[in-house]
Curated annotation (Swiss-Prot):
Adaptor protein complex 2 (AP-2) is a heterotetramer composed of two large adaptins (alpha-type subunit APL3 and beta-type subunit APL1), a medium chain (mu-type subunit APM4) and a small adaptin (sigma-type subunit APS2). Component of the adaptor complexes which link clathrin to receptors in coated vesicles. Clathrin-associated protein complexes are believed to interact with the cytoplasmic tails of membrane proteins, leading to their selection and concentration. Belongs to the adaptor complexes small subunit family. It comes from the Eukaryota. It holds the Pfam family Clat_adaptor_s. GO terms for biological process: clathrin-dependent endocytosis; protein transport; vesicle-mediated transport. Its main location: membrane. This is AP-2 complex subunit sigma. GO terms for cellular component: AP-2 adaptor complex; intracellular membrane-bounded organelle. GO terms for molecular function: clathrin adaptor activity. InterPro entries: AP_complex_ssu, AP_mu_sigma_su, APS2, Longin-like_dom_sf.
Length: 143
């Protein structure tokens, strides 16, 4: 199960945070800093995308200047979550048309809607890009 999902840039600014386990505000701030210090200096070519973190694992993937991080239980399948992160980015790309950091900042409510279509209550909910994009089209029509 997911504990949280963070999207951070190279400077450590959090662009999106979704918490599936209750944390205090102080703990959230501390976790954001720890996660960034953990994944930012890692070498993409020679180190894996999985990092042990407290009693969990952090599964992360870097796209351009953004780190997409998911904190999962130690007994969960890391590769499934790595693919789920990639799937989430593919949906963002399709929805926004070559997504960038500014899309996440200025359309954060849409990004949260996309995230909620892919993950539900800390579990992977949907794996079909077409189904997610169709649901998002229906949501866009309501606005």
């Amino acid at each position: 199960m997911l504990s949280f999902i963070l999207i951070q840039n190279r400077q450590g600014k959090t662009r999106l945070a979704k918490w599936y386990v209750p944390y205090s505000d102080e703990e959230k701030i501390k976790l954001k800093g720890e996660i960034h210090r953990l994944v930012a200096p890692r070498d993409q070519k020679y180190q894996s995308n999985f990092v042990e973190f407290r009693n969990h694992k952090v599964v992360y993937r870097r796209y351009a200047g953004l780190f997409f991080c998911a904190c999962v239980d130690t007994n969960d399948n890391e590769l499934a979550y790595l693919e789920a992160i990639h799937f989430f980015v593919e949906v963002l790309d399709s929805f926004f048309g070559n997504v960038c950091e500014l899309d996440l900042v200025f359309n954060f409510y849409k990004v949260y809607a996309i995230l909620d279509e892919v993950f539900l209550a800390g579990e992977i909910e949907e794996t079909s890009k077409q189904v997610v994009l169709t649901r998002l089209e229906h949501l866009d029509k309501l606005e």
